[in-house]
UniProtKB/Swiss-Prot annotation:
Its cofactor is Mg(2+); Mn(2+). Mg(2+). Can also accept Mn(2+). This is Acetate kinase. Pfam families: Acetate_kinase.
Length: 385
C-alpha cells in the first residue's frame, strides 16, 4: 500500500483537507468543512470539524487507520524568522507558533488550533508544519528590508516575509519541467491569482522579489484585501474617522479589494455585473489589472532577463481575459500572447504565448497540497511505501 499524507489547511471558519499519495502525485480524496463556530452551524469548533472531515473520508471508503497514513501536513501561513523549513511538530514548536500569532493574527491562530486538535485525534502519526513564508526566507536584503527605523524593525522582526511560497516554488519547478530546462537556468515570474493574490520574481530557482510583505495584506489587489496602501491612510482614519486599529485592520482585510470597490469578490460574478454596465465593477477590474501590470513590469526590470511568466491559482488558471489584459501591448518587452492558445481549453501546464515570443507564457495549475505532502515525506526521511 502506498504511503499517504493528510494535508490540513485550518482557517478561522473553515477546514480544508486532502488525502494525498505524494509518491504517485495523486489525490485520494478532498473536502472542506465550512461555517465553523457560526451561530447557525452544527459545527461548533475545529474538533467537530475534524471529526466531520473523518466522516466525509469514511463516506468515500477511506479508513485513516488502514490507508497507509504516515503523516499529517499542516499549512501554516507565517513562520516568522525562525521557521523556514518544514518542521516536525511537538509541544515546543507549537508554543513558538503561538508566539507568532502577533505577526499573523488572522491566519496563525486557527492553524495552531487545527494542529492541536489533529494531534489529539491522530496521535500515532507524525505531524509536520509547512510554512507559506519559507520559500521567501532568503530574499535579498534589499527586497526584504522596509525603510523604517532599523532599531524598531530589528526589535519587532519587521521585514518582508512573503506568502504563497509553497505555490510559487511548486509552480516554478513545474514550469521548468514543462520547458525541459533546469530550474537553476531560468529567470521566472509567477503570478498566483486567486482570492488571495501575489507575484514573485525567481532568479535561477531562488526568489528575489515578492509582492506580499510583513503580512499577506501587501501587494496586488485581492478579493477582499486592499494590497498596497499608503500607511498614512491608517493614521488618517484613526485621527479623523475615529476608527480603531482592529476596525481598520478588519476593513483592509475583509472589506477592501474587489469586494470594497465593487461589492463582489468573485471574478465570475464580477464579469456579469460589468456586462450590465456597472461602472464600479468596471473600475474595480481596471484597478486590479493596473496593479498586476505594474508588478509585472517591475519584476521584468528586477530580473533583467526573464525566460517565463506563469499564471496560476483560480483566476490565473481559469480567466483568459485577465491573462489577456495583463499582457496586452507587452510585445516590446518580449511577451507575445497567442490568443487562440489563451482561450483554448487545457489541462495541466500549457503554453499560451506564441512560438516566437522571447518570453514564454504558461498556465501552470498549482498543487499546494501535493507540495506539502512531499515536504512531509522529506521531513520523515523520504519514507516510501
Amino acid at each position: 500500500m502506498s504511503s499517504t499524507v493528510l494535508v490540513i489547511n485550518s482557517g478561522s471558519s473553515s477546514l480544508k483537507f486532502q488525502l494525498v499519495e505524494p509518491v504517485a502525485g495523486m489525490s485520494r480524496a478532498a473536502g472542506i468543512v465550512e461555517r465553523i463556530g457560526e451561530r447557525s452551524s452544527p459545527v461548533a469548533d475545529h474538533a467537530q470539524a475534524l471529526h466531520r472531515a473523518f466522516k466525509m473520508l469514511a463516506e468515500d471508503g477511506i479508513d485513516l487507520q488502514t490507508c497507509g497514513l504516515v503523516a499529517v501536513g499542516h499549512r501554516v501561513v507565517h513562520g516568522g524568522t525562525e521557521f523556514h523549513q518544514p518542521t516536525l511538530l511537538d509541544d515546543t514548536v507549537i508554543g513558538k507558533l503561538e508566539e507568532l500569532s502577533a505577526l499573523a493574527p488572522l491566519h496563525n491562530p486557527p492553524a495552531v488550533l487545527g494542529i492541536k486538535v489533529a494531534r489529539r485525534l491522530l496521535a500515532n502519526v507524525a505531524h509536520v508544519a509547512v510554512f507559506d513564508t519559507a520559500f521567501f526566507h532568503d530574499l535579498p536584503p534589499a527586497a526584504a528590508t522596509y525603510a523604517i527605523d532599523r532599531d524598531v524593525a530589528d526589535r519587532w522582526h519587521i521585514r518582508r516575509y512573503g506568502f504563497h511560497g509553497t505555490s510559487h516554488q511548486y509552480v516554478s519547478e513545474r514550469a521548468a519541467a514543462f520547458l525541459g530546462r533546469p530550474l537553476d537556468g531560468l529567470n521566472q515570474i509567477v503570478l498566483h491569482l486567486g482570492n488571495g493574490a501575489s507575484a514573485s520574481a525567481i532568479a535561477r530557482g531562488r526568489p528575489v522579489e515578492t509582492s506580499m510583505g510583513l503580512t499577506p495584506l501587501e501587494g496586488l489587489v485581492m478579493g477582499t484585501r486592499s494590497g498596497d496602501l499608503d500607511p498614512g491612510v491608517i493614521s488618517y482614519l484613526w485621527r479623523t474617522a475615529r476608527m480603531g486599529v482592529e476596525d481598520i485592520e478588519s476593513m483592509l482585510n475583509h472589506r477592501s479589494g474587489m469586494l470594497g470597490l465593487a461589492g463582489e469578490r468573485d471574478f465570475r460574478r464580477l464579469r456579469l455585473v460589468i456586462e450590465t454596465g456597472d461602472r464600479s465593477a468596471q473600475l474595480a477590474y481596471e484597478v486590479f489589472i493596473h496593479r498586476l501590470r505594474k508588478y509585472l513590469g517591475a519584476y521584468l526590470a528586477v530580473l533583467g532577463h526573464t525566460d517565463v511568466v506563469s499564471f496560476t491559482a483560480g483566476i490565473g488558471e481559469n480567466d483568459a481575459a485577465v491573462r489577456r489584459d495583463a499582457l496586452a501591448g507587452l510585445q516590446g518587452l518580449g511577451i507575445a500572447l497567442d490568443q487562440d492558445r489563451n482561450l483554448g481549453p487545457g489541462h495541466g501546464a500549457r503554453r499560451i504565448s506564441s512560438d516566437d515570443s522571447p518570453i514564454a507564457v504558461l498556465v501552470v495549475p498549482t498543487n499546494e497540497e501535493l507540495a506539502i505532502a512531499r515536504d512531509c515525506l522529506r521531513v520523515l526521511g523520504g519514507r516510501r511505501a
